[in-house]
Amino acid sequence: MIAWLDPHDPFPPVERALGPATEAPGLLAASRDLSPQRLLLAYRQGIFPWYSVGQPVLWWSTDPRMVLAPQALKISATFRKTLRRVLRDPDWEIRVDDDFLAVMRACAMTPREGQDGTWITREIIAAYGALHSNGMAHSVETWYRGTRVGGLYGVALGRMFYGESMFAHRTDASKIALAALCAFLGSHGVPMIDCQQETDHLASLGARPIARAEFLAHVRNASAQPAITPWWFDKSVLERWTATPATPAV
């Protein structure tokens, strides 16, 4: 039995989340409240929302937790060449926070294998849009010939980044945005990106599962650090990244 949260109720301890033998491992609580204040409270405790249209807001704390250290992003020799070409070619641009809400809508509308519909509801877009307006959520966007062709968004608290979703309308467009994000976060001492749930795709990018207790220790430390400001794309940071040896494939 999970907890039902009224607007002023605290979250229960994450250890009460449903276990691996249940139909919904990691499910902790449900509510109608999806205010920016509730979201911030959740992220600072390693909790995230994930639900479908017609459901209450479902709150999760998975164990293990999938995370990506910025320096662990797997960059093949082929993709490294792609990044170098993108950095040289004026047809390509990488932008930060050009249109956060447009990125969210693109993530919501992009079909995904094995998913029917989207969890990025109008309420989700409004809540994260409010965080963005307060400098606590950001988008990294890949543009080609004046059109946004890929991107991602997430929440930034202190030196912790919580990845939410990404999309691509052109080959490698979302991965280009992810590489730019990792280069930026790595240059600011961010130890990890929260990827939430374990998937083969995330593992192929270099993400790995860690125990929830270890993840929460990272969250407490990193989120208490000063926030990164300003958020902007520095081409030279990604150029230095592409100059390092290619990550061996595993």
Swiss-Prot record:
Instruction: Identify the GO cellular component terms for this protein.
Output: cytoplasm
Q: Which SUPFAM superfamilies match?
A: Acyl-CoA N-acyltransferases (Nat)
Return the EC number.
2.3.2.6
Could you tell me which Pfam families the record lists for this protein? Leu_Phe_trans (PF03588)
The enzyme's main class, written as a single word, is transferase
Share an example GO biological-process annotation for this protein.
Answer: protein catabolic process
Reaction(s) catalysed by this chain's protein: N-terminal L-lysyl-[protein] + L-leucyl-tRNA(Leu) = N-terminal L-leucyl-L-lysyl-[protein] + tRNA(Leu) + H(+); N-terminal L-arginyl-[protein] + L-leucyl-tRNA(Leu) = N-terminal L-leucyl-L-arginyl-[protein] + tRNA(Leu) + H(+); L-phenylalanyl-tRNA(Phe) + an N-terminal L-alpha-aminoacyl-[protein] = an N-terminal L-phenylalanyl-L-alpha-aminoacyl-[protein] + tRNA(Phe)
- The answer, when asked if ATP-binding is one of the entry's keywords, is no
Which Gene Ontology molecular function entries are recorded, alphabetically? leucyl-tRNA--protein transferase activity
Q: Where is it chiefly localized?
A: cytoplasm
Which keywords does UniProt give here?
A: Acyltransferase, Cytoplasm, Transferase
Report the subcellular localization.
Answer: Cytoplasm
The protein's matches in InterPro entries, at most eight in alphabetical order, are given as: Acyl_CoA_acyltransferase, Leu/Phe-tRNA_Trfase, Leu/Phe-tRNA_Trfase_C, Leu/Phe-tRNA_Trfase_N
Domain of life of the organism encoding this protein: Bacteria
What the record says about family reads: Belongs to the L/F-transferase family.
* Annotated function: Functions in the N-end rule pathway of protein degradation where it conjugates Leu, Phe and, less efficiently, Met from aminoacyl-tRNAs to the N-termini of proteins containing an N-terminal arginine or lysine.
* Name listed for the protein in its UniProt record: Leucyl/phenylalanyl-tRNA--protein transferase
Q: What organism is the protein native to?
A: Cupriavidus pinatubonensis (strain JMP 134 / LMG 1197) (Cupriavidus necator (strain JMP 134))
